Amino acid sequence: MRAVVQRVLSASVAAGSSRHSEIGRGLLVLLGVAQGDTELEAEWMSRKIVQLRIFDDAAGRMNLPVRDTGGDILLVSQFTLYGDASRGNRPGFSGSADFEKARPLYEKAVRSIEQHLGKPVMTGWYGEAMQVALINDGPVTLILDTPQRL
């Protein structure tokens, strides 16, 4: 499982003209599910995202996790995180899990993040084309990968 985690002042996602999710200060997380991922990877990634200490404490050091700041999380599925363009210019996505296998793991990650965060998580719409907007804070952007063997 791979996540691109961005500290934001605000973020939103839209699909079509009628569906919209947004947060204020917090984390925008783009989440990709790889071939072979299981609920173990979803749980590990969920804990890691919520526990990341990337918000400033009173001394101005990155020392606080999102849950200690009252911040929110916007979680957006993104299968292209496992795109491979090492040969040619058109990326292949064979490293991404199939739609039917990835969706339950994405949903597991949503539930697990909500449990660890202690409040609802805003999400995009799995498998749909979306428009994502954000105002970075810092900017602070991290790329997380689950360990090879859990």
UniProtKB/Swiss-Prot annotation:
Pfam families, sorted? Tyr_Deacylase
Q: Which residues form a coiled coil?
A: none
Keyword tRNA-binding assigned to the entry: answer is: yes
| Motif Gly-cisPro motif, important for rejection of L-amino acids mapped to chain | 138-139
Q: Which InterPro entries match?
A: Daa-tRNA_deacyls_DTD (IPR003732), DTD-like_sf (IPR023509)
GO cellular component entries:
cytoplasm
Keywords assigned by UniProt, alphabetized: Cytoplasm, Hydrolase, RNA-binding, tRNA-binding
Q: Which reaction does it catalyse?
A: glycyl-tRNA(Ala) + H2O = tRNA(Ala) + glycine + H(+); a D-aminoacyl-tRNA + H2O = a tRNA + a D-alpha-amino acid + H(+)
Where would you find this protein in the cell? Cytoplasm
Question: Which EC numbers does the record give?
Answer: 3.1.1.96
| Top-level taxon of origin | Bacteria
The record's GO molecular-function terms, alphabetically, read: D-tyrosyl-tRNA(Tyr) deacylase activity; Gly-tRNA(Ala) deacylase activity; Ser(Gly)-tRNA(Ala) hydrolase activity; tRNA binding
Gene Ontology BP annotations: D-amino acid catabolic process
* Entry similarity comment: Belongs to the DTD family.
Question: Subunit info?
Answer: Homodimer.
- What does the entry's free-text domain comment contain? A Gly-cisPro motif from one monomer fits into the active site of the other monomer to allow specific chiral rejection of L-amino acids.
Q: Describe the task this protein carries out.
A: An aminoacyl-tRNA editing enzyme that deacylates mischarged D-aminoacyl-tRNAs. Also deacylates mischarged glycyl-tRNA(Ala), protecting cells against glycine mischarging by AlaRS. Acts via tRNA-based rather than protein-based catalysis; rejects L-amino acids rather than detecting D-amino acids in the active site. By recycling D-aminoacyl-tRNA to D-amino acids and free tRNA molecules, this enzyme counteracts the toxicity associated with the formation of D-aminoacyl-tRNA entities in vivo and helps enforce protein L-homochirality.
Q: What is this protein called?
A: D-aminoacyl-tRNA deacylase
Q: Which organism is it from?
A: Chlorobium limicola (strain DSM 245 / NBRC 103803 / 6330)
The record's gene field reads dtd
